[in-house]
Amino acid sequence: MDKEECSSSESGWTTYLSSPIKVDEDEVVDEDYYYEGYNIYNYSSKVEHEEERNKDSDDSMASDASSGPNYQRFHQKNKALDLKNGKNEGNSKSKNDDDHHNHYHDGKKTSNSYRKKDKKKRENKSTYRMK
């Protein structure tokens, strides 16, 4: 069959033949050029969509659970230590927690705010004595 005797259209990998028609040579489209342009367009739009999706997610390059943020690993490590030391989630506060957060040392508070107040008291006492 000659090209001028029938027309065809492509859909995916399948070629459909239709009834014979007369084709003007001016209207003949270079199929290789058309499909090459189509493939380039599809590829570039696919890349744009992937880039857009990746903008929303900062952890798109994360390969495993151990590559998460440091604070999560620190929190999980402390939780594991608490469970190992006999603390459970329902009773997460203990005397050791108080000691750690309030900085008890030899029965005295040594937190920054307490030290500042104590320093003011000592300064007031020393100025009172000097007068």
From Swiss-Prot:
GO BP: any one term: cytokinin metabolic process
Motif SOFL-B: which residue numbers? Answer: 60-69
Q: Which residues form the signal peptide?
A: none
Motif range (Nuclear localization signal): 107-114
Q: Which UniProt keywords apply?
A: Cytokinin biosynthesis, Cytokinin signaling pathway, Cytoplasm, Nucleus
Gene name, Swiss-Prot/TrEMBL: SOFL4
Question: Where is it localised?
Answer: Cytoplasm; Nucleus
Motif residue range(s): SOFL-A: 11-16
Domain notes, please?
Domains SOFL-A and SOFL-B are required for function in cytokinin-mediated development.
Per its database record, what is this protein's job? Involved in cytokinin-mediated development.
Q: Does the keyword DNA-binding apply?
A: no
Ranges of biased composition (kind: Basic and acidic residues): 46-58, 79-109
Composition-biased stretches, type Basic residues, lie in: 114-131
Name the family the entry cites.
Answer: Belongs to the SOFL plant protein family.
InterPro entries in the cross-refs:
SOFL
GO CC annotations, alphabetized: cytoplasm; nucleus
Please note every region of biased composition (Polar residues): 8-18
Name the organs or tissues of expression.
Expressed, at low levels, in seedlings, roots, flowers and siliques.
Protein name from the UniProt record: Protein SOB FIVE-LIKE 4
> Where is the stretch described as Disordered?
1-21, 40-131
